[in-house]
């Protein structure tokens, strides 16, 4: 297989999709199984420092892992669609269903989790600077996971 061909392009797309998906879902496991229990048992000053410095970095990789997985997934689907070919069997429909579910997951990251986490991070920065706490930040943190 020549890497500078149509099949080579699909090869790279699949690998970028695979690696970015591992990044995205791996960080999701980190948030759920490592960070959340850690925050539950830490002292407030430690938690505040982690929210200000660690969480934004982890969320950056989480968000962009989701974005790259989303983009490469739809590029793979668009490259595989051909007149009368992709949706003839169950394979194409199964991949399309996966793409729709992945799109919903991506939208949750970008339009639910990230805006709520921005509020939580900004609240931690404001409180550390001596400003008043945002009462909506606690609820946003619960909603965003």
Over which residues does each language-model region extend?
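Polytopic transmembrane helical bundles with strong interfacial aromatic enrichment
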Residues: 1-145
């Amino acid at each position: 297989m020549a890497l500078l061909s149509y099949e080579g392009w699909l090869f790279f797309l699949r690998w970028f999709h695979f690696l970015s998906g591992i990044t995205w879902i791996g960080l999701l496991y980190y948030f759920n199984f490592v960070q959340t229990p850690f925050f539950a048992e830490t002292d407030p000053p430690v938690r505040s420092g982690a929210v200000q410095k660690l969480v934004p970095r982890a969320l950056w990789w989480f968000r962009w892992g989701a974005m790259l997985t989303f983009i490469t997934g739809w590029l793979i689907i668009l490259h595989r669609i051909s007149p009368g070919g992709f949706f003839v069997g169950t394979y194409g429909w199964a991949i399309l269903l996966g793409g729709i579910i992945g799109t919903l997951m991506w939208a949750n990251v970008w339009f639910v989790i990230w805006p709520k986490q921005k509020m939580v991070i900004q609240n931690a920065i404001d409180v550390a600077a001596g400003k008043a706490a945002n009462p909506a930040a606690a609820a946003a943190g619960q909603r965003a996971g």
